[in-house]
């Protein structure tokens, strides 16, 4: 592959509005469609600095710059529209995190790629509301935080307290939240306020390896590590009172709980197993990609179908996992306030996935088409009146949950028609990353990090050594950096703003 200098690379990238950029064909070999990415001035600098650094002599290894990853996805067989980079985009395995792409189901060459879903399949966010207010929680903040720690297992290697045997796991993988409902871990209405109603019907546990099942069995109902969290949040600002009221968010100071987790080691193993099989399928079917991390298979091949069935099972695992933690969160609150979750009005506002591939109908060149939409670090954002969103949100659009980094605000958005047309009903998912985990461990001081969290009045139990550095403000971006481009700039129309939580 020819290595170009930075100025030559820039000739393939065109600013098309204040906050959006087109990546022209030719930027990377064999591009079938153009790429596009959205960024404000600060994110723009991060993206182009990353590209500039990659052009320096001797800069090899690690992930490619996000801009090049968007372009490499644009070269995959069967892609339609554009390869889209959303405002929290940063480099990842294969696809950049914050990259979405759609593939034509009627095209026999179209592919599915585990790198377009990620290793933490159906990593997602769930938001619960309560009838509590900041004044109720502030005096017992430390005790409530400890109660959550006591109820929800956290960290690498954590084991769940939800009783489950191998037979239960098989049923949970197939049934998703229907299993949780049957076992009494969720309320019936929880399922209605969940993407796909908490169950991928295409799941087939027989396509999942025993190793994946062995890894997943003890982890149900656990938060995990990394950027996962169960966070008590306060409604700080309401932008759209009608949309907020439909979600049960009525007043400033109201307490909500956001749970961010996924399929844990189970999903990671499903992805790992699939990559091995897909490399074989690529050789057999003579599929070539610009990056070996984009290992893939034809959608309708045995390998492609097996992956989609196993991925769906992992997605169901993740919904059961978040449902189990919802149960445990309700128990923690009930214990602290000596009442019931029902009396605390602890209803699920919505649950969204941001690492998944799903078959959806979209308009392409004026005609409806069945597409396999890959969203990696990307949240579904369907508009008002869409048949796949709950009755409660038909007039507002789907709630879109965008979690902030530790110590910064999160946002609740709603999907729009314009976003449906321009980004296949997708938007950003989180704060994004400025430093890798390895760099944060090397460069960020634990005592300094703890000082920041202490000044922000974080409960002492939350100031753990690894978390303090992972969530350091220098390492992670803030939601305001990209929720403003998503919600208010005409060039990034994928969602409209409803409210802000801190």
Swiss-Prot record:
<dbReference type="GO" id="GO:0046872">
    <property type="term" value="F:metal ion binding"/>
</dbReference>
<feature type="binding site">
    <location>
        <begin position="354"/>
        <end position="355"/>
    </location>
    <ligand>
        <name>GMP</name>
    </ligand>
</feature>
<keyword id="KW-0819">tRNA processing</keyword>
<comment type="similarity">
    <text>Belongs to the RtcB family.</text>
</comment>
<protein>
    <recommendedName>
        <fullName>RNA-splicing ligase RtcB homolog 2</fullName>
        <ecNumber>6.5.1.8</ecNumber>
    </recommendedName>
</protein>
<dbReference type="GO" id="GO:0005525">
    <property type="term" value="F:GTP binding"/>
</dbReference>
<comment type="function">
    <text>Catalytic subunit of the tRNA-splicing ligase complex that acts by directly joining spliced tRNA halves to mature-sized tRNAs by incorporating the precursor-derived splice junction phosphate into the mature tRNA as a canonical 3',5'-phosphodiester. May act as an RNA ligase with broad substrate specificity, and may function toward other RNAs.</text>
</comment>
<dbReference type="GO" id="GO:0072669">
    <property type="term" value="C:tRNA-splicing ligase complex"/>
</dbReference>
<feature type="binding site">
    <location>
        <position position="123"/>
    </location>
    <ligand>
        <name>Mn(2+) 2</name>
    </ligand>
</feature>
<dbReference type="GO" id="GO:0170057">
    <property type="term" value="F:RNA ligase (GTP) activity"/>
</dbReference>
<dbReference type="GO" id="GO:0006388">
    <property type="term" value="P:tRNA splicing, via endonucleolytic cleavage and ligation"/>
</dbReference>
<keyword id="KW-0342">GTP-binding</keyword>
<feature type="binding site">
    <location>
        <position position="410"/>
    </location>
    <ligand>
        <name>GMP</name>
    </ligand>
</feature>
<keyword id="KW-0479">Metal-binding</keyword>
<keyword id="KW-0547">Nucleotide-binding</keyword>
<dbReference type="GO" id="GO:0005634">
    <property type="term" value="C:nucleus"/>
</dbReference>
<keyword id="KW-0464">Manganese</keyword>
<feature type="binding site">
    <location>
        <position position="123"/>
    </location>
    <ligand>
        <name>Mn(2+) 1</name>
    </ligand>
</feature>
<feature type="active site" description="GMP-histidine intermediate">
    <location>
        <position position="429"/>
    </location>
</feature>
<feature type="binding site">
    <location>
        <begin position="429"/>
        <end position="432"/>
    </location>
    <ligand>
        <name>GMP</name>
    </ligand>
</feature>
<dbReference type="InterPro" id="IPR036025">
    <property type="entry name" value="RtcB-like_sf"/>
</dbReference>
<feature type="binding site">
    <location>
        <begin position="403"/>
        <end position="406"/>
    </location>
    <ligand>
        <name>GMP</name>
    </ligand>
</feature>
<dbReference type="InterPro" id="IPR027513">
    <property type="entry name" value="RtcB_euk"/>
</dbReference>
<keyword id="KW-0436">Ligase</keyword>
<feature type="binding site">
    <location>
        <position position="260"/>
    </location>
    <ligand>
        <name>Mn(2+) 2</name>
    </ligand>
</feature>
<dbReference type="Pfam" id="PF01139">
    <property type="entry name" value="RtcB"/>
</dbReference>
<dbReference type="InterPro" id="IPR001233">
    <property type="entry name" value="RtcB"/>
</dbReference>
<feature type="binding site">
    <location>
        <position position="354"/>
    </location>
    <ligand>
        <name>Mn(2+) 2</name>
    </ligand>
</feature>
<comment type="subunit">
    <text>Catalytic component of the tRNA-splicing ligase complex.</text>
</comment>
<feature type="binding site">
    <location>
        <begin position="227"/>
        <end position="231"/>
    </location>
    <ligand>
        <name>GMP</name>
    </ligand>
</feature>
<feature type="binding site">
    <location>
        <position position="228"/>
    </location>
    <ligand>
        <name>Mn(2+) 1</name>
    </ligand>
</feature>
<dbReference type="GO" id="GO:0003972">
    <property type="term" value="F:RNA ligase (ATP) activity"/>
</dbReference>
<feature type="binding site">
    <location>
        <position position="120"/>
    </location>
    <ligand>
        <name>Mn(2+) 1</name>
    </ligand>
</feature>
């Amino acid at each position: 592959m020819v290595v170009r200098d930075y100025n030559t690379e820039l000739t393939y990238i065109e600013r098309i509005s204040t906050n959006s950029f087109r990546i022209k064909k030719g930027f990377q070999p064999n591009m079938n469609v153009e790429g596009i990415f959205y960024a404000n001035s600060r994110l723009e600098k991060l993206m182009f600095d990353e590209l500039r650094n990659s052009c320096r002599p001797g800069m090899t290894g690690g992930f490619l710059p996000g801009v090049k990853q968007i372009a490499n996805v644009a070269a995959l067989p069967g892609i339609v529209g554009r390869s889209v980079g959303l405002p929290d985009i940063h480099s990842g395995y294969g696809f950049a995190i914050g990259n979405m792409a759609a593939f034509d189901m009627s095209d026999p060459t179209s592919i599915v790629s585990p790198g377009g879903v990620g290793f933490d399949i159906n990593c997602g966010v769930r938001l619960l509301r309560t009838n509590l207010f900041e004044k109720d929680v502030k005096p017992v903040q430390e005790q409530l935080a400890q109660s959550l720690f006591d109820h929800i297992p956290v960290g690498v290697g954590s084991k769940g307290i939800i009783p489950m045997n191998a037979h239960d796991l098989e049923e949970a993988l197939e049934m998703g939240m229907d299993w949780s409902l049957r076992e009494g871990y969720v309320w019936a209405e929880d399922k209605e306020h969940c993407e796909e109603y908490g169950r991928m019907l295409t799941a087939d546990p027989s396509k999942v390896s025993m190793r994946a099942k062995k890894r997943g069995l003890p982890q149900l109902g656990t938060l995990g590590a990394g950027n996962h969290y169960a966070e008590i949040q306060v409604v700080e600002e309401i932008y759209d009172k009608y949309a907020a009221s439909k979600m049960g968010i009525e007043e400033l100071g109201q307490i909500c709980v956001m749970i961010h987790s996924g399929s844990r080691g189970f999903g990671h193993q499903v992805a790992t197993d699939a990559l091995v099989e897909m490399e074989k399928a690529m050789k057999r079917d003579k599929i070539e990609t610009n990056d070996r991390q984009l290992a893939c298979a034809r959608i309708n091949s045995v390998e492609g179908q097996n992956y989609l069935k196993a991925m769906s099972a992992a997605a169901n695992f993740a919904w059961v996992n978040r449902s189990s933690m919802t149960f445990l969160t309700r128990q923690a609150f009930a214990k602290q306030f000596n009442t019931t979750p029902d009396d605390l009005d602890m209803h699920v506002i919505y649950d969204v996935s941001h690492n998944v591939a799903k078959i959806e109908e979209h308009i392409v060149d004026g005609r409806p088409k069945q597409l396999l939409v890959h969203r990696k670090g990307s949240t579904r954002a369907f508009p008002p009146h869409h048949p796949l969103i709950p009755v409660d949100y038909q007039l507002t659009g789907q709630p879109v949950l965008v979690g902030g980094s530790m110590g910064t605000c999160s946002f609740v958005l709603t999907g729009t028609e314009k976003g449906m047309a321009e980004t296949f009903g997708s938007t950003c998912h989180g704060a994004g990353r400025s430093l890798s985990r390895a760099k944060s461990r090397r460069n960020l001081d634990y005592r300094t990090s703890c000082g920041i969290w202490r000044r922000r009045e974080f409960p002492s139990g939350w100031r753990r050594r690894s978390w303090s550095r992972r969530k350091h403000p220098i390492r992670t971006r803030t939601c305001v950096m990209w929720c403003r481009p998503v919600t208010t700039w005409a060039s990034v129309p994928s969602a409209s703003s409803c409210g802000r939580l801190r």
